[in-house]
Amino acid sequence: MGSAIVAALRVAGVPATGPHGRGYDGAGDAVVLLCVPDDAIGVAAQQIVPGPLVGHCSGASGLDVLGDRSGMSVHPLMTVTRQGADFAGVWAAVAGSDRAALAIASSLATTLGLRPVRVDDADRPAYHAAAAIAANFLVTLESAAAELMSTAGLDREVLVPLATAALQNWARSGPSALTGPVARGDTGTVALHRRVVAERTPHLVGLFDALVGASQRLAAADSTPGSGIGSAEPGTTGPGSGSTGSGSAATTSAP
């Protein structure tokens, strides 16, 4: 993450340095962004000298991990690979210990091309858990489907168009995008599916049952008049444009 952020800031004309390693203390920098594992944020923050505004890129952690100093956070809601990242149009959770820190976090996000949305510390665990379900568990789910498909002699690539279309439909329609035997109330087919899962991939029965139950509740809610299922407006965004502070910005990738 640190390398991707530094590269994007330089493209935007911000005099960013780094990523820095162990022993970096932030002397001479106006803003220091800690791009380290969650468990290392506190130790890394303690190494920064007084003066710079210190932030982190964790989605699950609050500002308390930075100690008593003024702090901020910017968490791009995306997956960053070794090939880099395109931050344009991606949502980012921002927070600040005061108005000035929040303004800098929001300005940093917009400079990167991100869309800042304020997420308070109390809501961070729920925010990050939802992100994990949407991204990490999606891979687990599709891998389970591919494993079962392989017992029919077919590769996972046959599932890609189906999975892609389902995700695109959900993006457009939300819960109403649910299709298939559970949505139709076809209990016979659901029972047939469960039997073959139990026979060929018995370790997936628990996952299958949980997904059927969740899908049944979703289908029932979607078919209830006045259920109110639909899209929701994004959360409140933080302050928009503003300076990221005088001097240079820096990121550190290790405590």
List PLM regions with ranges.
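Internal alpha-helical scaffold of NAD(P)-dependent oxidoreductase catalytic cores
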Residues: 5, 85-171, 214
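Rossmann-like NAD(P)(H) cofactor-binding subdomain of soluble oxidoreductases
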Residues: 3-10, 22-85
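Hydrophobic anchor at the start of a short beta-strand
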Residues: 13-17, 54, 71, 116, ...
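NAD(P)-dependent Rossmann-like dehydrogenase/reductase catalytic/cofactor-binding core
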Residues: 157-255
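Predominantly flavin-linked oxidoreductase catalytic cores and closely associated redox partners
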Residues: 60, 67-70, 77-82, 86, ...
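Alpha-helix C-cap/termination motif
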Residues: 12, 47-51, 111, 151, ...
